[in-house]
A protein has these predicted regions:
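Beta-strand/loop-rich accessory regions of lumenal/periplasmic or secreted enzymes
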Residues: 1-195
Length: 195
């Protein structure tokens, strides 16, 4: 899923693998944690191409540092997320960095699955483990937006820390229907027999 935001949302904070980009077949050097960076300062390639992905991400917040407006994405399951100031088409069409247009928007990518990079430019293709089958999938995420800490902000101040990710556990109810429980909630753990 791709969302397009105003280019002014340059401050990125995420909970996932980092601090540098990670891809499904190139993530051993990444460590889970909360990281921050300016999307304009992400490492870039000499030949424009996709960049800036963070695998195993649970949450990402993009903020306008001048106005403190923010947009936050919270994944229902670990996903691959990125935020870059160029569209895929702009990166594809440019052979050199000077051919890229001045950034006019921020492109946020939320990927349930992402194909590995491989090395097909000078070697073998992606290993079968890192390929993606052409099949339907379902994923979910929550979107939160706020106006920052100005007097006219009806949402209140921006939280300083991203809350910890708590995976939900699928359980089967007594009548056989599937349900989900939040393992961080003691009452739900007890009711689901997860204690």
């Amino acid at each position: 899923m791709t969302a397009i935001l105003p280019v002014r949302f340059t401050a990125m904070k995420w909970y996932g693998k980092g601090p540098l980009e990670t891809y499904p077949d190139r993530q051993c050097g990444g460590r889970m944690g909360v990281y921050s960076e300016d999307v304009r300062n992400q490492p870039f390639y000499l030949r424009p191409q996709e960049y800036g992905l963070h695998t195993e991400s649970r949450s990402m917040r993009l903020t306008d540092p001048d106005r403190a407006d923010f947009v936050r994405f919270e994944a229902a399951c670990p996903m691959a997320m990125s935020a870059v100031p160029y569209s895929d088409l702009q990166l594809w069409n440019a052979r050199h960095p000077f051919e890229l247009p001045a950034p006019e928007a921020l492109y946020v990518h939320l990927d349930y699955a992402h194909r590995g990079l491989g090395n097909s430019s000078c070697g073998p293709d992606v290993l079968p483990t890192y390929r993606i089958d052409d099949r339907p999938c379902r994923f979910g995420f929550a979107l939160e937006a706020g106006l920052g800490e100005r007097e006219d902000n009806p949402f209140g101040p921006i939280p300083e820390e991203i809350p910890a990710y708590h995976p939900w556990k699928a359980v089967e109810e007594q009548d056989g229907t599937p349900s989900y429980r939040d393992p961080s909630d003691p009452d739900q753990r007890s009711n689901a027999g997860m204690v």
